[in-house]
């Protein structure tokens, strides 16, 4: 199992801009959305492309967790999983960016046998097919999540954004 952690990933201005967007959401989350754009135009995807093969990249899905719990799961094509009654297809990798972490008790990211402590401005990129979850927590824990794909997942059967 592989993962990479990059601390202080964004410069302060970029981090502040992302934090402002989260503040506007209040307690809501960014809904899961599909985008088809060059990965070189997205700092998170560009970083992931340094360690994962993006030669067949088609687009990415993004969403957020704004102080929300995450039960154990594997990032997968949910539409394909439902349609095939349990078969799995995975993204290129999974990307978690900690936008804001304050006064946190608990809330560690569990990657099978590894535990990662959340920290503001921390980027975590990990291999596809890994069970992961978030321990119960109190405090502020805001994350921005991205899954890049080599195809458009069956989950997204509407128009491309």
Predicted stretch roles:
Residues 1-70:
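Non-heme Fe(II)/2-oxoglutarate
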Residues 56-161:
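Catalytic core of non-heme Fe(II) oxygenases with the double-stranded beta-helix
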């Amino acid at each position: 199992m592989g993962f990479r952690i990059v601390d202080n990933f964004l410069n302060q201005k970029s981090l502040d801009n992302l934090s402002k967007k989260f503040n506007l959401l209040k307690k809501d989350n960014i809904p899961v959305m599909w985008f088809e754009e060059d990965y070189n135009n997205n700092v998170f995807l560009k970083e992931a492309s340094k360690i994962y093969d993006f030669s067949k990249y088609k687009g990415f899905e993004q969403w957020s967790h704004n102080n929300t719990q995450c039960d154990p799961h594997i990032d997968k094509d949910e539409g394909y999983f439902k349609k095939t009654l349990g078969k799995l297809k995975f993204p290129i990798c999974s990307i978690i960016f900690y936008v804001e972490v304050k006064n946190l008790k608990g809330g560690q990211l569990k990657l099978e046998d590894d535990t990662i402590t959340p920290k503001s401005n921390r980027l975590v990129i990990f291999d596809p097919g890994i069970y992961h979850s978030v321990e119960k927590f109190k405090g502020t824990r805001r994350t921005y999540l991205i899954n890049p794909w080599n195809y458009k997942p069956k989950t997204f059967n509407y128009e491309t954004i």
